[in-house]
Amino acid sequence: MVRTRVLFCLFISFFATVQSSATLISTSCISQAALYQFGCSSKSKSCYCKNINWLGSVTACAYENSKSNKTLDSALMKLASQCSSIKVYTLEDMKNIYLNASNYLRAPEKSDKKTVVSQPLMANETAYHYYYEENYGIHLNLMRSQWCAWGLVFFWVAVLTAATILNILKRVFGKNIMANSVKKSLIYPSVYKDYNERTFYLWKRLPFNFTTRGKGLVVLIFVILTILSLSFGHNIKLPHPYDRPRWRRSMAFVSRRADLMAIALFPVVYLFGIRNNPFIPITGLSFSTFNFYHKWSAYVCFMLAVVHSIVMTASGVKRGVFQSLVRKFYFRWGIVATILMSIIIFQSEKVFRNRGYEIFLLIHKAMNIMFIIAMYYHCHTLGWMGWIWSMAGILCFDRFCRIVRIIMNGGLKTATLSTTDDSNVIKISVKKPKFFKYQVGAFAYMYFLSPKSAWFYSFQSHPFTVLSERHRDPNNPDQLTMYVKANKGITRVLLSKVLSAPNHTVDCKIFLEGPYGVTVPHIAKLKRNLVGVAAGLGVAAIYPHFVECLRLPSTDQLQHKFYWIVNDLSHLKWFENELQWLKEKSCEVSVIYTGSSVEDTNSDESTKGFDDKEESEITVECLNKRPDLKELVRSEIKLSELENNNITFYSCGPATFNDDFRNAVVQGIDSSLKIDVELEEESFTW
C-alpha cells in the first residue's frame, strides 16, 4: 500500500512537471514566432491557425526545445488548444504539420520581421530563451498563488484534524490533555470581558459580537496567514515582454493571487455553513463554532475579492482600457459577483438577522444561488471551474441530505403540541421514526405545515433539542419529546393555537429533519463528577448529557449534581418525570427559584408533586434573585478537589446566563488545582 501511494505521488509530480514544461514551451514558441510577419494581424487567431507556415514554425520550435517525448506531445497539444475554437487539430495532425515543415525550414532573418514569411522558420533561440525565462517567472508566480490558495484550505484541514484528535482522545480513551492553565487563559474566556453570546454595544449603538480567545486565536492566525500569503513573491525581472512597468506586473500578480485565494475559500465557506457538515460528528465542534468559522472565512474571502476587484479596476483605469474591460462578458459577471458577495456579507450581520430572520433567510439563500451563477459566468472562460462546481456540489449535497432525512423519518408526520395555562413552553411529542437514532446532544429541525398560517412559515425549519428516547420514557415508549419556548414568529403562533385548543393540546402536521448534532459516542469510563447548571429551557439541553453519563460504568463512586434555575415554578410540571429519573440515579437535584414571590396558588401546585414523594424529594430553593454563579462553581470545585475527582460542568441557558457561567468557571479555575476542570456549554445562540 505504501509503495502504491509513493508511485502514485511520483506519477502526479511527473505529470504536473510535464504539463508545466509543455505550457512554458508552447507559450514561448508562440511569443518568439510573433516577432515575424506571417501576414496576419496580432489579434487574428483565425489567420494564424490556418497559416501553414506559422503552424510549421511553432511545431518546429516545440520539437527543438522539448527534452522528452511526453513533454513534446503535451506541448503540441497545448499549441493545438490555442486553435481549438478555429479548427480542431489532433496530436497526429500536429506531428504531420511538423514533418511537412521540416522539409522547408530555414533560419529567420531580420527582413522576416517586415516582409511576409513564405516558409516555416526555425526557432530564434535567443528570443525563445528570453520568453521562456519571463514566462517561467509568470508560471512560478501562478504556482505560488496556487500554493497560497491551497495553504488556506490546508490551514482549516489542520484545525479540524487537531479537533478530531482531541475529540477522540476525550470520548474514546478518556484522555483530556488540555491543562487547566490553557483553559483558563485561552479556551474558555472571552476576547473582551465576559461577552460571548451577548452583543456588546459601543456607545449604546454600534453592535459588536465577541468570541472566546481560543476561537479568536484560530481566526487571527488565519487572517495573518492570508495577509502574509498575499504579500510575498511578486517580484519579476525587468524588462518584461508583456508588462514593462513594474507596477503593472506587480498589480497583475497581486490581483491573480487574491483571486485564487478567494476562490479556494469558496468550498470552505459553504461547507462550514451547511447543516450536513460531515466534520461536526468527528471533530466534536458545535454548529455554532463552525458557523463562527464560516462567517470569518466569508469575511476573508470577501476582502480578497475586493482586493482583486480594486486592483483590476485601478489597473484598467491607469492603462486606459477600463471601458474595453467592462464590455467583456467575464468582467461584467465579476462585478456582479462582487456586488452579490457584498450584499450577502452585509445582510448577514446579527443586527439584521435579529430584526427580521425570515427576510434574512430568503435573501441569503437567493443571493448564494445567484453568486454561484455569477462566478460560473465569470470563470468559465478563465479556468478554475473546479472551485465553482465545489460550491454548487456542497449546496446540492446539503439539500439532498435534508430531503433524505425527511424521507427516512417518514415524510409527513403528526406531532402533538401541549402546554399548561400559565406556561409559554410548548411540549412537542412525535412518534419516533424507525431510522431515527437518538444520541445525546441530538437535535432535529421541524417544518410546521398549516394552511392557516403565513405561507412562509412552511418553508422555515426550526431546531429543537431531542429530549427522550425509546427506552427512557415509560409513559411514551415510542415518542420523541422536545420542549420549545415561544418567542416570536411561528413558535408564538403555535402557542396561541395550543392555548385556544381544548385541554391545551393540538395536533400539527410536520416534516421532521434529523437527527443532527450526533458525534463520536462516549465510550470511556466516567471518572469525573458531573455538575449541570441549567437556566430556563436550557434544562432540555443539559438533561440528555446526564442521561448518557449516568448510564456509563463507575458512576456510583462519584458525586453528581443537577441545578435548574427557573423564574416560574410552573415549569416543574412539564419536567417532573425527568427530574425524578435523575434522583433515582443518585444524582442530587436542586431547583433554584429566582422569582419575586412564591406565595401564590400556582407555586403551591407546582411544588406539591415533589413534597408528596419523600424518597425522591427534590430541593426547591427560593432565592428571589439570581444565584451567585461564581460561588456555586467555586464550592463545587472545592468539593471535587477534596474528593480528588475531576469535574465537568454542563451549562445551558439564555445568552446572559451562559456568559456569566462561563466567566464563573474561568474565575474558579486556579493554577494550584490538582484536579481537571472542564466546561461543556450548550447554546441556543448560533
UniProtKB/Swiss-Prot annotation:
Give a yes or no for keyword Transmembrane helix in this entry. yes
GO annotation, biological process: copper ion import; intracellular iron ion homeostasis; iron ion transport
Q: What does the UniProt entry say about where the protein is found?
A: Cell membrane
Annotated signal sequence range: 1-22
* Pfam families registered for this protein in UniProt: FAD_binding_8, Ferric_reduct, NAD_binding_6
Q: What else is known?
A: Present with 892 molecules/cell in log phase SD medium.
Function (record text): Metalloreductase responsible for reducing extracellular iron and copper prior to import. Catalyzes the reductive uptake of Fe(3+)-salts and Fe(3+) bound to catecholate or hydroxamate siderophores. Fe(3+) is reduced to Fe(2+), which then dissociates from the siderophore and can be imported by the high-affinity Fe(2+) transport complex in the plasma membrane. Also participates in Cu(2+) reduction and Cu(+) uptake.
Output this protein's name: Ferric/cupric reductase transmembrane component 1
